[in-house]
Design a protein with these regions (language model features):
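Conserved beta-strand signature within the Rossmann-like core of class I S-adenosyl-L-methionine
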Residues: 159-167
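Conserved SAM/SAH-binding beta-strand->alpha-helix loop
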Residues: 89
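Class I SAM-dependent methyltransferase "Motif I" SAM/SAH-binding loop
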Residues: 64-68
Length: 221
């Protein structure tokens, strides 16, 4: 990816005014949509891979891992953890990688909405939970499509672990920080982020294009 990425344009000039009410409503009313069979099969495959590496090893989820570069980097940084990278696109997951997938990582094609709930239903606790450069859905009317505005969002609290979300859209991270504050009861802040070692192709492209990067982090226990 070359450094020619466009800046995000939105009519929003700050966190969505309806975010708090939406998050509180979702916290009060659990998401009940039936889980698709193919996602159950994908979840079983992920659990089998974890068991092969060692079920007692701490688990890291890279939610929306795209072409799979970030799970490689995370696995290298945490060799004593098992990393599950999940993306809904088999095309993205099948693209070439700079190195082979290590023994402590697996890439899974699944819908995150179902995968998160399956983790929670099975009582699985995450050590770390990454959400790197998700689709920002910048239109004002698309709040419920952003993860912080989605009905599945409260499940994150059940999964625990150290959560980190990054984006090149400041407002997205400000919203995520606000939503995570509501979810956790902690003070979560949006902060600028700079790195010389980009974790994903998008992060590399955004840096090369002169974008500001933002992140928020919280420990959900």
């Amino acid at each position: 990816m070359s450094g020619n990425s466009r800046f995000i344009v939105s009519a929003q000039d700050g966190p969505h005014r309806d975010l708090e009410a939406l998050v509180r409503r979702h916290m009060a009313h659990p998401f009940r949509k039936p889980i698709a069979d193919y996602n159950r099969e994908a979840f079983a495959a992920a659990m089998a891979a974890w068991a092969t590496f060692g079920r007692k090893k701490p688990l890291i989820l890279d939610a929306g891992c795209g072409v799979g570069w970030s799970p490689l980097n995370i696995a290298a940084s945490y060799p004593d953890h098992f990393v599950i990278g999940v993306d809904q696109s088999i095309d993205r997951l099948s693209r070439g990688k700079p190195v082979e997938l290590p023994a402590n990582a697996v890439l899974i094609r699944a819908d995150l909405v179902d995968f998160w709930r399956l983790l929670a239903e099975n009582g699985i606790h995450l050590a770390r939970h990454y959400n790197l450069y998700p689709n920002p859905w910048p239109k004002i009317g698309h709040l419920a499509r952003r993860w912080q505005g989605h009905a599945v969002f409260p499940v994150w609290r059940e999964l625990g672990g150290e959560v980190e979300c990054r984006s090149n859209w400041r407002i997205y991270i400000e919203e995520m920080a606000q939503a995570l504050s509501l979810l956790s009861g902690q003070s979560v802040v949006a902060e600028p982020y700079v790195t010389e070692l980009p974790m994903t192709p998008f992060e590399k492209k955004y840096l090369a294009s002169g974008h500001e990067l933002w992140r928020c982090r919280v420990d959900l226990g």
